A protein has these predicted regions:
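Acyl-CoA/ACP chain-elongation machinery
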Residues: 146-199, 203-204, 237-251, 285-292, ...
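Conserved active-site "lid/cap" helical segment
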Residues: 1-68, 134-137, 258-277
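Conserved small-residue
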Residues: 41, 66, 131, 138, ...
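Active-site-proximal alpha-helical scaffold in enzymes
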Residues: 36-50, 103, 107, 121-156, ...
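Condensing-enzyme catalytic core mediating Claisen C-C bond formation in acyl metabolism
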Residues: 178-274, 279-280, 384
């Protein structure tokens, strides 16, 4: 018997209408996340301004690493989703659904179809911090001298019914009824879905998004030898566990530790004055009631500890939603954009800060702030 019911969550951070990555190459029934991988990784490599063959001529094959994957795996019908649904739907399981569903498959695609890489390959699965874990592998490989080049990325395409069912059952997403209550709308009025994600304001849940983000890292010597365009530098990625917790999904003490280490490391490079006067935070900013209180408290405490007053805080998820594994990549991309253009993006989906948000030492940006590229010495961004 067919069953049809209306989903109470009707907003998501989707690819632009009409953009179909599967039409840009021979997709051959690839899951959507792998289609995004091919497009995003190709874009990153071709945006170097340097032919990849020129890079390969200078770097031994075993000194190139690729760290890419997803957190949830490929769960649509061409991946694990079809593997689990086929018999129920009266169809046959294909030979591709099992292997293409694995979480490490984005990295395998980059190696096999784009780079022909013979060097290190792998991914960490770490939920919303997956991009950061992969980035940490790359940074440490380059710092140790074992690698000179690293391609880092994550891909997530979680916009399908079963995923929404899971997150909705957790009360994690901004649903229509809750959005109507926030805006005092009648039952027959449609919420403003573009304002569904409201970090640090009165909010109700996050907005699920799909995305792929890839970056290419060189060591210093190779960067100068090739004359590469330098968008930024990564000195370290800090990760800490949360200790004992009552709920596995709640934040913990590890967030304070990792953020404090990141700020201290930034101060060691740019100096105390630059940290206090010319740094900002690209926050996790999911748009959930729990996040607005816990993350704001962390940032407020860290700012006070390091003598920072009115620390500017942005939240890129107010634009693109929460892309799970790729969310930290979204934050990094936004940060590099601020470096390049001297503009800190405001949180334009909000017009006030919630009463339970810690505001001491913080300046939540509710409008774009143009400060000039030369005025940004450091960015410490957090992912909780």
């Amino acid at each position: 018997m067919d069953c049809f019911r209306k989903n109470n969550v009707n907003c998501a951070g989707q690819l632009p209408t009409g953009f179909k990555p599967e039409l840009l190459y021979q997709a051959r029934n690839h899951p959507r996340a792998l289609q995004l991988t091919v497009y995003a990784a190709s874009d990153a490599i071709n945006s170097l301004g340097i032919d990849w063959e020129a890079v390969r001529q200078l770097v031994p094959p075993d000194q190139i690493g690729v760290y890419a994957g997803s957190a949830m795996g490929q769960l649509d019908y061409n991946g694990f989703g079809g593997l689990l649904q086929a018999r129920i739907l009266g169809k046959k399981v294909t030979s591709k659904q099992m292997p293409l569903g694995y979480a490490e498959m984005p990295g395998d695609f980059v190696n096999a179809y784009l780079l022909g890489n013979l060097g290190t390959n792998g991914t960490n699965v770490a939920a919303c911090a997956t991009f950061l874990y992969n980035l940490r592998h790359a940074v440490r490989d380059i710092q140790s001298g074992t690698h000179r080049v690293a391609v880092v990325g994550t891909t997530e395409a979680p916009i399908f019914p079963e995923s929404f069912d899971g997150f909705t059952t957790m009360n994690a997403l901004a649903d229509d009824d809750s959005l109507r209550k926030l805006d005092n709308l009648n039952v027959d009025q449609e919420p403003n879905y573009r304002r569904a994600c409201r970090p640090f304001a009165e909010n109700t849940g996050f907005t699920l998004g799909e995305a792929a983000q890839f970056v290419v890292l060189f060591d210093d010597e190779l960067t100068l030898e090739l004359g590469a365009n330098i968008l930024g530098g990564i000195n370290e990625v800090f990760i800490a566990a949360d200790g004992h917790k009552k709920s596995i999904t709640s934040p913990g003490l590890g967030n304070y530790i990792s953020m404090a280490k990141a700020v201290a490391a930034t101060r060691n490079i740019v100096g105390e004055e630059a940290l206090k006067q010319r740094s900002n935070v690209q926050s996790h900013g999911t748009g959930t009631p729990q996040n607005r209180t816990t993350e704001s408290h962390i940032l407020s405490q860290i700012a006070g500890t390091f003598g920072i007053e009115k620390w500017p805080v942005s939240a890129i998820k107010s634009y693109v939603g929460h892309t799970i594994a790729t969310s930290a990549g979204d934050q990094l991309a936004a940060t590099l954009g601020s470096f390049a253009h001297g503009i800190l993006p405001g949180i334009l989906t909000i017009d006030h800060i919630a009463d339970d948000v810690s505001q001491d030492n913080l300046d939540f940006l509710m409008a774009h702030r143009e400060i000039g590229a030369e005025s940004i010495d450091a960015v410490s961004y957090t992912h909780l």
